[in-house]
Design a protein with these regions (language model features):
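A short helix-loop-beta-strand connector motif used in the catalytic cores of GNAT acetyltransferases and
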Residues: 43-60, 79
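Residue-level recognition of the GNAT/N-acetyltransferase active site
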Residues: 75, 86-90, 118-120
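Conserved acetyl-CoA-binding loop-helix of GNAT-fold acetyltransferases
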Residues: 85, 91-104, 130
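A short beta-loop-alpha structural element at the N-terminal edge
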Residues: 2-17, 27
Length: 134
């Protein structure tokens, strides 16, 4: 398993993974609602590529061989905006490794003291607490 920064060329693949996980884990279980429209708008590949090219957004991927199995995105302000792991690869510590990589980058490269996240849906709050978020 390799955790590394994604290139702009890989952002569409990261969005595809995020959309697939969202469909399975969230949209099917929580039909309707504004959060779906927000997610659909947020995962606009062109916008994400532009933000990444401008240095406003950073993305990491967890790769097993040639397959992207997890993705994490963080803004230049240190806010985690995306954390998705393929359902066949959960419970392997991939999310924690992605978060750790983002936190180290925030501290070392962006010189930030803390990283933030909004746990959506709410049932993910326990996961983020265990990962050190308050």
């Amino acid at each position: 398993m390799i955790i590394r920064r994604l290139t702009n060329e890989e952002i569409p693949q990261a969005c595809e993974l995020a959309r697939g996980v969202y469909e399975i884990a969230i949209r099917r279980n929580f039909p309707g609602g504004e959060s779906h429209a927000f997610f659909d708008e947020y995962t606009d590949e062109e916008r994400l590529c532009t933000e990444a090219a401008q240095g406003q957004l950073f993305m990491w991927g967890a790769c097993e061989g040639n397959m992207l199995v997890g993705v994490c995105a963080m803004t230049i302000q240190g806010h985690i905006t995306m954390l998705y792991v393929h359902p066949l690869h959960v419970k392997k510590g991939i999310g924690k490794k992605l978060l750790r990589k983002a936190r180290i980058f925030a501290r070392m490269e962006l010189k930030l003291q803390q990283v933030s996240v909004n746990a959506v849906p709410a049932y993910t709050a326990g996961y983020f607490r265990k990962a050190g978020f308050t």
